Amino acid sequence: LDLGKTPLANELQPARGAKFKQEIFDLIVGKCDDCMHIQLLTMVNPSKFFKNYPYFSKINSTTDVRFQNLSSSLDRRYGERNDNFLIEIGSNDGSLCAKFLSLGWRVLGVDPAESPVRYALENGIDSICDYFSSSVAENILDKYGLPNLIIANNVLAHSDHLRDIFLGIKLLMNNQTVLVLEVSYGLKVFENFLFDTIYHEHTSYHTLFSILPFLDSYGLKVFDVEQFDAHGGSIRIHI
């Protein structure tokens, strides 16, 4: 699916009159015939998105309600330890971590966006400003130990280094650790013509058909899947 050349979706232009050269990039979606994974064929350096990332989770009231419901639900299901510990990959400004913190969890966020992470730290959310990777996971393991819950909401769409991300996730898991992933549901993207969700920051579009074998290759077994309406249609995968 060739959508031509477009500028970056979240690249804000300066005030009128300032000189600004806006780059454009190919926006082409392809599907692998072997594994059925759907992704962009041209990848943009992620520093162009995250160095001056404008999005803060806290500004979205709908997201706040969803985070409140999610934290309460996951606390009931998986908050069985006396020392519950959450690691959130793609934690942004710490809004979801803060919900768990109020429930008595120890929390750690990891996110590459400087301004949201700075906000999280200023508001008492332990956070690492970096792209999550196997090397970051090793450092977390040494300093913090194993969590009993890992959350990655809308993270997998934003990276073309999924294998290293999952190597890192595996390092932080044992038999008692639960991983919860949220992804925009690729089936709904194409079934409902959600073309506005296709832009350079979203490198991948996931379906269960493609993601289940991928998870299985890391020995990760899915035991529950929820479908909900966020972002035009999403799925939450419990592993």
Go through each PLM region and give its residues.
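N-terminal juxtadomain amphipathic helix
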Residues: 1-62, 226
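Conserved class I S-adenosyl-L-methionine
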Residues: 82-92
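Conserved SAM-binding loop of SAM-dependent methyltransferases across substrates and taxa
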Residues: 93-104
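Conserved SAM/SAH-binding beta-strand->alpha-helix loop
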Residues: 113-115
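Conserved SAM-binding strand-loop segment of SAM-dependent methyltransferases
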Residues: 124-139
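A conserved beta-strand element that flanks and buttresses the S-adenosyl-L-methionine
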Residues: 148-151
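A short glycine-rich, Lys/Arg-flanked "PGG" loop and its adjoining helix->strand segment in the class I
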Residues: 163-178
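Short, glycine-/aromatic-enriched active-site segment of Class I SAM-dependent methyltransferases
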Residues: 179-204, 208-211
